[in-house]
Regions:
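N-terminal nucleic-acid-engaging modules of covalent nucleotidyltransferase systems
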Residues: 1-185, 254-272
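Electropositive nucleic-acid-contacting surfaces
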Residues: 2-6, 78-79, 84-89, 196, ...
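Metal-assisted phosphate- and nucleotidyl-transfer catalytic regions
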Residues: 3-7, 171-218
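Flexible, glycine/threonine-enriched loop-and-boundary segments that flank and lead into catalytic domains
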Residues: 31-52, 56, 189-194, 211-247
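Short glycine/proline-enriched turns and hinge-like loops at secondary-structure junctions
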Residues: 64-66, 218-221, 249-254
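Acidic, His- and aromatic-enriched active-site or binding-groove loops in soluble protein domains
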Residues: 126, 204-205, 231-236
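Alpha-helical scaffold/interaction cores of sigma-54-like transcription cofactors
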Residues: 204, 244-250, 274
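Generic long, charged, amphipathic alpha-helical segments
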Residues: 274-284
């Protein structure tokens, strides 16, 4: 419910953990999805029908509105200043007094309108200066897919079906500015596979599969959400950065930034962290 571990510790010491409540003034840990190999696996795990959505190759953003609008990354870093146009879209096209939204910001090509890879938008996240110039060079579209708080009430215990209905009632969609993720609801394998192929053709990562009755579980990998991604050909990459882990993995390098060769330079691809087994982690 809260990403503020200091607050949790203080409340635990005073035996007041029940006082932790969702608030549009503080970000929470985002809900996460398990990996599935195909539609059959999602139907088996989630039941039927399933809501399938495009999986956006963008940057996860949590949007909070109380007195003002604030934008946070999945790691709860405040990046509001880096996306002034997104704040403008939210103020203009979302009708609510206060809210917490789950979304993906994705860069797009001004000429073709097609989405650009994650690396493009990462340049904006890192930028502290010349923000307006970067906004013109790398415009973004906000794709909203969930709502956890609305007009003074937590929605985390509401079903996905109910939450999506609220989103559809308060967001005035504007292409290349602010939209809801495209979705279908089906119990048909062929329809799901067709939707997956369509997502790949249009340049997306794959699709998300969600149980219509699932509640929002902050910071957890649960069976309520699953993802089906395109299987890529093997790549030759190099590690250009490593970060130390926390807790049980403190003192070990557990997160690796990888890159591939692009002409005479290295192009950052992203981070790799999952899949490191305890037996081999001592080699890092």
């Amino acid at each position: 419910i809260t990403g503020d571990y200091g607050e949790v510790a203080e409340l635990a010491v005073s035996n007041n953990l029940s006082d932790v409540k969702l608030s549009p003034d503080k970000p929470l840990n985002s809900m996460l999805a398990l990996l599935a190999k195909d539609a059959d696996e999602t139907f088996e795990a989630l039941g039927k029908p399933v809501q399938f959505e495009y999986k956006i190759d963008g940057f996860r953003l949590q949007v909070l509105k109380s007195k003002t609008i604030k934008l946070y990354t999945r790691r709860l870093e405040n990046v509001t200043k880096q996306f002034p146009e997104v704040v403008e879209y939210l103020n203009k096209y979302v009708s609510a007094h206060d809210f917490i939204l789950d979304a993906e910001a994705v860069a797009f090509d001004l000429k073709t309108g097609r989405h650009k890879p994650f690396q493009t938008i990462s340049q904006r996240i890192k930028r502290k200066y010349n923000i307006e110039e970067m906004a013109k060079k790398f415009p973004v579209e906000l794709n909203i897919f969930d709502i956890m708080y609305y007009n003074g009430k937590s929605l985390t215990d509401k079903t996905l079906k109910e939450r999506r209905k609220i989103l559809e009632s308060i967001v005035k969609q504007q292409k290349k500015k602010i939209v809801l993720t495209e979705k279908i609801v089906t119990d048909n394998k062929k329809e799901a596979e067709k939707f997956f192929k369509k997502s790949i053709k249009e340049g997306y990562e794959g699709i998300m599969a969600k149980n219509l009755e699932s509640t929002y579980r902050p910071g957890r990998y649960v069976n309520g959400w699953m993802k089906i991604k395109r299987i890529l050909d093997p790549l030759d990459v190099v590690i250009i950065k490593a970060e130390y882990g926390e807790g049980k993995r403190a003192g070990w390098l557990t997160s690796y930034t990888i890159a591939c060769k692009s002409k005479n330079s290295l192009l950052e691809l992203g981070k790799v962290s999952t899949g490191v087994k305890e037996k081999t982690s001592g080699l890092t």
